[in-house]
Amino acid sequence: MSFNTFGHLFRVTTFGESHGVAIGCVVDGCPPLIPLTEADIQGDLDRRRPGQSRFTTQRQEADQVKILSGVMVHPETGVQVTTGTPIALLIENTDQRSKDYSDIQNKYRPGHADFTYEAKYGIRDYRGGGRSSARETATRVAAGAIARKVIAGMTVRGALVQIGPHKIDRDKWDWDEIGNNPFFCPDKDKAAFYADYLDGIRKSGSSIGAVVEIVAEGVPAGLGAPIYAKLDGDLAAALMSINAVKGVEIGDGFASAELTGEQNADEMRTGNHGPAFLSNHAGGILGGISTGQPVVARFAVKPTSSILTPRKTVDRTGHDTEILTKGRHDPCVGIRAVPVGEAMVACVLADHLLRHRGQVGG
């Protein structure tokens, strides 16, 4: 299997499977002399870690990260810093239950990558889905924590803005509420509703989709390049690469199709440090290049395909059958996708910042 690496100058390669011994990543291209410890990474991993509420998978993984290379204690300052060499990170798997998947060893789960992996490679890891499992995203979050160090001065935050058909009230958006509920929801009232709503989904053995919004502030104007290195193009590709993501939009996205030219244009006036925009329908990117406004992206996460409802499928021999999935699964995997989305946006911004410096200096 190839294509486990993304990025150009800030490059991330992930490895490992859901039920393997460990998962991990190698971050190449991180500049030297950036202070970095395992604690800097662990905080982000703890936000994504499973088993923290009844609304996520009950798989219990500590997700303790180990830095294997790429750092050393500076001989003069005594601070551990990056050396500019590849940074290898490892996270051990400790709570696999592969026996839960023995009944589906020869059956394809509808809506899952079971069939397509086997169609391509002639083999698939039925134990938790292997590389197609959301377990792989822990490594992205670890890499994203390093990327945040590279883009110091920029702030990347995410929020769950919709579960099923139920959207938050944007007039009640409060970033401080994100850490007060298990949904990363900025709307206090909607978070309470989501608790009751997801309890019903969870108890029925079903699952539901969600929409996540990522906002990056402090992004300077000028990141990205036409035509095939557009910032929004790379953001879309990075977010689409997250397991279970089926749609991405930047700024107003698909809603812009309903607007007139007068409504959609982000008008400008003279500001203290260049143009001051009167709106941000473009999501902080025009012509593939950042405008200096907040970069805004949203992505849709499909419902978890592993549910308790019997479904029609076929087996590996081509016969019709039914499948009933056991194991521990997220009733709404979109919840834990919030820190994953943040990480991917941070990695893309780090990559584009380094590319921008290489092209125009600064």
Curated annotation (Swiss-Prot):
Keywords, ordered alphabetically: Amino-acid biosynthesis, Aromatic amino acid biosynthesis, FAD, Flavoprotein, FMN, Lyase, NADP
Reactions performed catalytically: 5-O-(1-carboxyvinyl)-3-phosphoshikimate = chorismate + phosphate
Cofactor binding remark: Reduced FMN (FMNH(2)).
Any one of the GO BP annotations: chorismate biosynthetic process
Annotated transmembrane regions: none
Gene3D superfamilies the record matches: Chorismate synthase AroC
EC category name: lyase
Coiled-coil ranges (or none): none
EC id: 4.2.3.5
A Gene Ontology cellular-component term: cytosol
HAMAP family found in the cross-reference section: Chorismate_synth
Quaternary structure annotation from Swiss-Prot or TrEMBL: Homotetramer.
Family affiliation: Belongs to the chorismate synthase family.
Protein name: Chorismate synthase
Organism: Rhodopseudomonas palustris (strain TIE-1)
